[in-house]
């Protein structure tokens, strides 16, 4: 009975495989939104102010960072929790594949969240005159929370690896 239970439990990791594959659909959606934004600004780029162009650029960078985060979670999550990725010898392999354990992945995800939060905060500061002070305070507090959490996770990871 114990062997059957353990085999079933071990096999249940494959439930995560379609979830990781589903993240690729989210990635596709981000790609569509990215190019939708590009095609939206192209006809009006000469009429845009510099501030508006910077804000659009920050939004595009934000989408790119989220996309990178999705790729990192998809691949390393699959490798850590489901099965090793067997890409052919003739295809190029990402240098970090197989090297991110769950602790490293958490740190990279936390760093990505801080970077994404920083982009959002920069967008807020560029439009500061149109945003309530209370909202700015909350954005700052949330960002500081992300930064402190990422720092604490990195510190704890460093302490446990000693």
Curated annotation (Swiss-Prot):
InterPro entries: UPF0114, UPF0114_bac. GO terms for cellular component: plasma membrane. It comes from the Bacteria. The chain crosses the membrane at residues 10-32, 53-75, 136-156. It holds the Pfam family UPF0114. It is a multi-pass membrane protein. Keywords: Cell membrane, Membrane, Transmembrane, Transmembrane helix. It is found in: Cell membrane. Belongs to the UPF0114 family. This is UPF0114 protein SO_3997. It comes from Shewanella oneidensis (strain ATCC 700550 / JCM 31522 / CIP 106686 / LMG 19005 / NCIMB 14063 / MR-1).
């Amino acid at each position: 009975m114990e062997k059957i239970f353990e085999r079933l439990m071990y096999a249940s990791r494959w439930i995560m495989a379609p979830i990781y594959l589903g993240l690729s659909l989210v990635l596709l959606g981000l790609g569509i939104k990215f190019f939708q934004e590009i095609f939206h600004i192209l006809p009006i780029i000469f009429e845009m102010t510099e501030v508006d162009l910077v804000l659009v650029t920050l939004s595009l960078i934000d989408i790119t960072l989220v996309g990178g985060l999705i790729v990192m979670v998809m691949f390393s999550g699959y490798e850590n929790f489901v099965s090793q990725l067997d890409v052919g010898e003739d295809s190029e392999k990402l240098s970090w594949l197989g090297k991110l354990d769950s602790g490293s992945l958490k740190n990279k995800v936390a760093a990505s969240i801080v970077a994404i939060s920083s982009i959002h905060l920069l967008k807020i500061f560029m439009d500061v005159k149109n945003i309530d002070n209370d909202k700015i305070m909350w954005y700052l507090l949330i960002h500081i929370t992300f930064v402190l959490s990422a720092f604490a996770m990195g510190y704890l990871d460093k302490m446990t690896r000693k």
